[in-house]
Amino acid sequence: MNKKLLRHIFKGLTNPNNKSYIKVDKDIHYIMPDMACAVRIEATDNPFVPGKAFNAAPEGVDRLFNKGADAVKLLLTGELTVDGWRDVRTLRSKDGREIYIDNNYLNFLSDEQQLLLYLDDKSVKAIRDDGIVEAVIAPLRSKH
């Protein structure tokens, strides 16, 4: 994955006026524009600090992660539903977690696209006690 594409992916995240992120409890996960994924970023592993290294492993699904983080794979599960009270989309995972997605992110989706995140137990090798996970990037899937 070249630097130009990385800049494109992170464009919405580096602009403080465009809050394209989701929150899981108190942990911040970032939503990447144009791609369906969630990334757990530790405060000490800020990907926007110059000099931080990233890598992508294209294996059907690109996995983007900070080389400096001791990460494990986790693919979140659920599908988008509407939560009118919070005026955001809610991703409810099979294990009961709720992930709230800021409406600003929906600007990156076309009318013909629906964001889906799936859980594949075979993809989950381990989850450390501190909860550091590797990002999993999946293409947006058409709802047709």
Regions found by a protein language model. Give the residues of each.
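DNA polymerase processivity clamps
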Residues: 1-144
